């Protein structure tokens, strides 16, 4: 009975189908769906393409712009913020939003208008048929948005005089009901008249006359 030969010193071959070439090893997990040799730039990512990137899956994955996160060596050699376009954490600063593990998150479509700074917002609205002012409800071209905001917010609210209607005066354009004798009305500087309760409600969302919004 001969002794069983030892296999301790025998070189172990590669497993079938497994490459030992280091170049075939994929990048670390935090690179997600990015190609290591390419430049992403600013681009929209679908819901499926941002899975596994640190987003809370219990919430709706938002629309946003994403940039690839740099490697550990890039972050180590990035300095302490000497380059104003970079923060040393692997993504390029473009303004607005907040950053979440290798991407620039600017919020959902519904809230994008509220989160974008003014130097980025015109790009968004120019691609979406202008901008509707929340103060006066007028449609404004994106390149006039900042000026319009300043004028609209600094414009004083219209005043009016209370009065009691002495005779029927047609239709109130706010509630579309008749202005009848004895109704309490509001007379604006432009001489338009409305039910007092109607114009009070109107002024909560708009500072201009319903029939003369440009005044």
Swiss-Prot record:
Membrane topology: Peripheral membrane protein
Region (Disordered) residue spans: 1-39, 66-96
Keywords assigned by UniProt, alphabetized: Endosome, Lipoprotein, Lysosome, Membrane, Metal-binding, Myristate, Transferase, Ubl conjugation pathway, Zinc, Zinc-finger
Gene3D superfamilies: Zinc/RING finger domain, C3HC4 (zinc finger)
Keyword Zinc set for record: yes
Domain of life, source organism: Eukaryota
Protein name as it appears in the record: E3 ubiquitin-protein ligase znrf1
Organism: Danio rerio (Zebrafish)
């Amino acid at each position: 009975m001969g002794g069983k030969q030892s296999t301790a010193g025998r070189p172990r071959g590669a497993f079938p189908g497994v490459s030992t070439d280091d170049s075939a090893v994929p990048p670390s997990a935090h690179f997600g769906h990015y190609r290591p040799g390419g430049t992403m730039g600013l681009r929209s990512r679908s819901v499926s393409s941002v899975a596994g990137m640190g987003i809370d899956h219990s919430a709706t994955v938002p629309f946003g712009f994403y940039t690839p996160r740099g490697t550990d060596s890039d972050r180590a050699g990035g300095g302490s913020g000497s380059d104003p376009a970079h923060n040393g954490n692997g993504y390029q600063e473009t303004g607005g939003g907040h950053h979440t593990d290798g991407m620039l998150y600017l919020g959902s479509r519904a809230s994008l208008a509220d989160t974008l700074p003014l130097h980025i917002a015109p790009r968004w609205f120019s691609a979406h048929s202008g901008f509707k002012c929340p103060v006066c409800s007028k449609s404004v071209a994106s390149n006039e948005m900042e000026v319009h905001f300043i004028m609209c917010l600094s414009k004083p609210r219209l005043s009016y005089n209370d009065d009691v209607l002495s005779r029927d005066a047609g239709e109130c354009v706010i509630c579309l009901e008749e202005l009848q004798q004895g109704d309490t009305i509001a007379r604006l500087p432009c001489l338009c008249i409305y039910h007092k309760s109607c114009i009070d409600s109107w002024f909560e969302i708009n500072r201009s006359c319903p029939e003369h919004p440009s005044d």
